[in-house]
Amino acid sequence: MWYVMQVRTGTEENIRCLCQRLISSNVLERCFIPYYQQKKRFQGEWHIQERILFPGYVFLIAQNLECLVNGLKKVIGLTKLIGIGDQIVPLVQEEVELLMRIGTDKQLVEMSSGIIENDRVRILSGPLMGMEGNIRRIDRHKRIAYLEIEMFGRTVEMKVGLEIIRKE
C-alpha cells in the first residue's frame, strides 16, 4: 500500500533519509519523493533541473500500517499521514497508477515536448502524452505545464516540464 506523509516544505529529503534509517526495511518497503524535470536557462545555456513534484509530501510504501505508524513515531519533523478525518488511508489504485505512468520506477517525471495547434496542446513525446485534458495552463517562458489531477482525495495542481516546440 502507498501512503503519503505531510512534512514541512523544504525538509522532504531529510525526512526521507530519517525514515530509511530509523524504520526497518521489513516494515517500510520504500520511501521516496517524486521529482519532475524542468529546463532553466542560466550562463547562456539550457540546463535540466530536478524539482519536487509535490512539495511538502513524502511517499511511503508499506504493507502493515500499524507497524509503519509505530516506526514513524521515531521520525522527528513528521506533520501527519494523509487520510480522511482521523482515518489513515492509502492512495487509491488510480493515483498509484498515475504516479507510476508519469514517473516510472525512478519517480522522475521527465520533460515532455509538444506543439500548439489551433490553441490546443498536442503532446508529441514524454509522460504527458494522453494527458492533454488535464493541462490547465502552460508557461512557455519557464517551460512548465500546470495540470489538475485528483490526488490525496482532492484536486491538486501539479507542475511538470513541457517544452512547446512550435505554435501553429
Question: What residues fall within each predicted segment?
Answer:
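Short coil-to-beta-strand transition motifs
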Residues: 1, 124-132
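Acidic-enriched and Gly/Ser
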Residues: 1-120, 148-168
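Short beta-alpha junctions and helix-cap segments that line functional grooves
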Residues: 45, 131-135, 146
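Residues embedded in well-ordered secondary-structure elements
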Residues: 49, 122-124, 136
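Short linear motifs in intrinsically disordered
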Residues: 110-113, 134-139
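Short, conserved beta-turn/loop elements at beta-strand boundaries and strand-helix junctions
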Residues: 126-128, 138-143
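Terminal RNA-binding accessory module
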Residues: 131, 142, 154-156
